[in-house]
Amino acid sequence: MITYKTDIKASLQSSESSMPVLAMCYDFDKTLTPDDMQAQGFIQSVGYDEEQIKQFWQESNQLAKKNDMDNNLAYMYKMIQEAVGRFYVTREKLMEYGNQVELYEGVRTWFERIREYGLEHGVCIEHYIISSGLKEMIEGTEMAKEGAFTKIYASAFMFDDKGVAVWPAQAINYTNKTQFLFRIQKGILDINDTGVNDYVKPEDQRVPFRNMIYIGDSDTDIPCMSLVNANGGHSIGVYDPVKKDKDKVYKMMRHHRIRYYAPADYTNGSKLDTLVKQIIRKTAAYEVLEGEYVHCKHEAEE
């Protein structure tokens, strides 16, 4: 079991210290894991064999199209419907499926390793999940249970008094993902807090976009990648290190959606590991200069 030395409360208080915060934001499916989380146990448990997993998604997408429905709401509805007569979809059940999810090599220890590297260089690292997948499944992973993430933003169910999923509580799609970057920027993490719309001076932003890293794998990450890129941050496209299909990251690179790409290999010394550590060192150096700028600016305005 990995012990996380920096808890969420301490991490959130770090903005009040002299240590700059670097927010690392991740998609989940095919970014931290090789496949969709639902396809790693749940879909099979409702009667689809390995050869029929694509059929589940096709039926879900057809449901969305037929009813002018959000694709994520459609798959959540279908999950509940397909489970009828088989088992109850409870938070605990979904967390069990999440615990079965296969992770890319190195992911299991990545978050604390990078956090410790940041602290060694005077940078507080916070890890965020921004995913269209299921929050309950992500919460079932070992690293989530151990406190790796400052916040998990993902689609989620509402549960009745018996603990059974009855309705979507939150649906995250590729466009509304960007709101969570603004929440992180301003330090307003509660999804119901309307303060995210308030103006915050650049020097008062808790995590300016230049201090964000967004790691994703596909078109659904483009709005977040573009927002981070356009504001001086770092967007990284990842691809499966086994299949080595770079078509998506090449396309994102040509269209200026990402600044870098690397295999989804999270082991110590990998290309991704080296790249992120370079960004951490750059952040540490830049924020010293930025602090001096803010000091001069405030003194001149007094």
Give residue spans per PLM region.
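Alpha-helical substrate-recognition element adjacent to the catalytic core
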Residues: 2-161
